[in-house]
């Protein structure tokens, strides 16, 4: 959520920047009319409150003098009714302003390249050389089925499309990947591991920006319920949601920052806008596992924190010896709440291309303002909004895809990366 003062004082400049850099058309006229009316109602409410207070004091004085106070009492009652009506209109208008503000994306950092879509992203660096194969390359689906470890037909029977049943050594490898990632981030990168709910309320989803704009991408547990919004839940699309909201409505000591958290969770996404895309295999699932990285930092530290967090995700790929590239997203490809994002794309031999395996973003104070997450300096005791960052460290299913395809042998066996062998009981090959 953008700073309301920015929208009030620099509305035209913000609208121009959003249109030029994001392709987002801000409804300037509506916002301007709402703000003008808000100012009028604010003054009217304050004047009515002051007049009502003044008349109420006169009642006491008149009563002490033995005068008839009934006319004054009627006047105070009338002022109270007008005040209640003005407050109600002001509250409704402020809610309308907030509802509109919640649909406005974050402003991109000036270092983000201009562009309309992913074709205009900028490659920053590459790591590792894709392996040359002297045999026909199999994709992860064929390899997983050869190892009797990926069963999509069973998942269709149990649930439907875009789900999978993993079995045997493939399931074990999937588990090993998540354990390896957690151990790396907690033991070498100083993240604190957390276990979080997989169901969250709507306030939590508003805090990180999934609501109100992306409600159709979520799995809601009771979408037709008439219960209060506070009792309605949705399955988490990423552990970023519960982890980041741990600081909602909190004031943190600046000396305690950065706060670095990680969690391994299943993630649930309806993929509402992805019909017909990546229908084969594990690339785009309704349910998938991910190890998430979240940092809560001082505002002046967030850009450096983005570089650090991205490096932490890169380390997973490097230790697994998986070729990848780092891409700086352009303005047209960034997420709704991000001010700057790096994507890490891993090499998939069967597709002969790089595919996203991690997205690392600096959200600036966009989420913090929604959550009212602040920090306080010990020296001057003043509070200010924190900055929040998040990234995949990594998506476990896509990492499994990359391991299966990059470590495949001519006979269909899969070599286990060296760093994973301690998690696999010393096993060197699957199949």
From Swiss-Prot:
Keywords: Aminoacyl-tRNA synthetase, ATP-binding, Cytoplasm, Ligase, Nucleotide-binding, Protein biosynthesis. Coiled coil: none annotated. PANTHER family: SERINE--TRNA LIGASE, SERYL-TRNA SYNTHETASE. It comes from Pectobacterium carotovorum subsp. carotovorum (strain PC1). HAMAP family: Ser_tRNA_synth_type1 (MF_00176). Pfam families: Seryl_tRNA_N, tRNA-synt_2b. Pathway: Aminoacyl-tRNA biosynthesis; selenocysteinyl-tRNA(Sec) biosynthesis; L-seryl-tRNA(Sec) from L-serine and tRNA(Sec): step 1/1. This is Serine--tRNA ligase. Consists of two distinct domains, a catalytic core and a N-terminal extension that is involved in tRNA binding. GO terms for cellular component: cytoplasm. Gene3D superfamilies: Bira Bifunctional Protein, Domain 2, Serine-tRNA synthetase, tRNA binding domain. The keyword Protein biosynthesis applies. ATP binds at residues 269-271, 356-359. One of its GO terms (molecular function) is serine-tRNA ligase activity. Catalyzes the attachment of serine to tRNA(Ser). Is also able to aminoacylate tRNA(Sec) with serine, to form the misacylated tRNA L-seryl-tRNA(Sec), which will be further converted into selenocysteinyl-tRNA(Sec). Belongs to the class-II aminoacyl-tRNA synthetase family. Type-1 seryl-tRNA synthetase subfamily.
């Amino acid at each position: 959520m953008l700073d309301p003062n920015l929208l009030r004082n620099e509305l035209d400049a913000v609208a121009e920047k959003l249109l030029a850099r994001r392709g987002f058309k801000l409804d300037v006229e509506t916002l301007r009319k709402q703000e003008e009316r808000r100012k009028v109602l604010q003054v009217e409410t304050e004047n009515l409150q002051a007049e009502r207070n003044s008349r109420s004091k006169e009642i006491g004085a008149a009563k002490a003098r033995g005068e008839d106070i009934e006319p004054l009492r009627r006047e105070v009652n009338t002022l109270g009714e007008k005040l209640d009506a003005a407050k109600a209109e002001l509250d409704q208008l402020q809610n309308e302003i907030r509802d509109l503000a919640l649909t406005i994306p974050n402003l991109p950092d000036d270092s983000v390249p201009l562009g309309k879509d992913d074709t205009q992203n900028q490659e920053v660096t590459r790591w590792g050389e894709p392996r040359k194969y002297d045999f026909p390359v199999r994709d992860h689906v064929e390899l997983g089925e050869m190892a009797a470890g990926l069963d999509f037909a069973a998942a269709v029977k149990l649930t439907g499309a875009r789900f999978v049943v993993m079995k045997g050594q493939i399931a074990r490898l999937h588990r090993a990947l998540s354990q390896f990632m957690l151990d790396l981030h907690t033991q070498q990168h100083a993240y604190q591991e957390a276990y979080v709910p997989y169901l969250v309320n709507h306030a939590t989803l508003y805090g990180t920006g999934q609501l109100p704009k992306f409600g159709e991408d979520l799995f809601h547990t009771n979408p037709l319920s008439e219960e209060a919004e506070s009792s309605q839940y949705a399955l988490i699309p990423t552990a970023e949601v519960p982890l980041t909201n741990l600081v909602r409505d909190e004031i943190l000591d600046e000396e305690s920052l950065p706060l670095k958290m990680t969690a391994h969770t299943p993630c649930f996404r309806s993929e509402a806008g992805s019909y017909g895309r990546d229908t084969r295999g594990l690339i785009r699932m309704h349910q998938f596992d991910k190890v998430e990285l979240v940092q809560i930092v001082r505002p002046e530290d967030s850009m450096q924190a983005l570089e650090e967090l991205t490096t932490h995700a890169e380390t997973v790929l490097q230790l697994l010896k998986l070729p990848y590239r780092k891409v700086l997203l352009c303005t047209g490809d960034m997420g709704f709440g991000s001010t700057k994002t790096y994507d890490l794309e891993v090499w998939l031999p069967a597709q002969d291309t790089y595919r996203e395996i991690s997205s690392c973003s600096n959200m600036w104070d966009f989420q913090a303002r929604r959550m009212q997450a602040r920090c306080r300096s010990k020296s001057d005791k003043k509070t200010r909004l924190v900055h929040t960052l998040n990234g995949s460290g990594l998506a476990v299913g896509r990492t499994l895809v990359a391991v299966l395809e990059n470590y495949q042998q001519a006979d269909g066996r899969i070599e286990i990366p060296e760093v994973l062998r301690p998690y696999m009981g010393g096993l060197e090959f699957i199949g």
